[in-house]
Amino acid sequence: MLRPRVSVTVDPFTRIATVRYVGAINGDVIIPEVLRLYGALERPWEYDCIWDMRRHTGRTETRDNEALARGWQAICGGRDIGRYTAIVSDDALIGARLPLTQRLFPFRTLAVFATVEMARAWLETARADTEAPSVA
């Protein structure tokens, strides 16, 4: 049995924050903890995110996503415009909820992946596409 836990790890060089929640933990516990940990980062709006939910066996509901969106907005205040969030899950409901979740986070681009490797590859490609030098 997995010990329920929430973690946020940060790579300051790649500017990627990885959020993981593991075990039978529900959204009413996950969301406040994620917001506390993410909010403690210096300039958190400068990070792209990977949300790794592969070992999550609890439940999150639409109201949890809405609470996360409100807290996220309070922390980032729209300064995360153009950032990316890769969600890693094999739960079909996560993919089905993506259009609703995307509307809750209008400044970020969200996508769902089966593996962390696929999520990282998407982030690298998306970043390369948006960081191309402009012609003056």
Label each region the model flagged.
Residues 1-136:
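Amphipathic, Lys/Arg-enriched alpha-helical "gate/interface" segment within cytosolic domains
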